[in-house]
């Protein structure tokens, strides 16, 4: 899809959710994980098609920053601990979340900025 043309086929992005979603009829799934089959989709209503615009939806967090991640982990520690007990195969320990965040957060912020710029450019055509 043109809005996603520079995204790698596989990449690591931050997840913090315990629920999934069904895609709208006619949507194209653009991302999935082993734990959650629907992680993102693109979609066009008839009005979007007329305008040449798209709905782009993600169930992951490109917007997490090096500053916000420790706050999220601290404030969400009870949820993390519960998740570690209930879903140990998909929930990571706080130290692992912070280490992986430090590794991936900047490239994901750049990916988000690129997607936003493409969305804005497509809306201005």
Language-model features, listed with the residues they occupy:
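Pocket-forming structural segment of enzyme catalytic cores
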Residues: 1-67
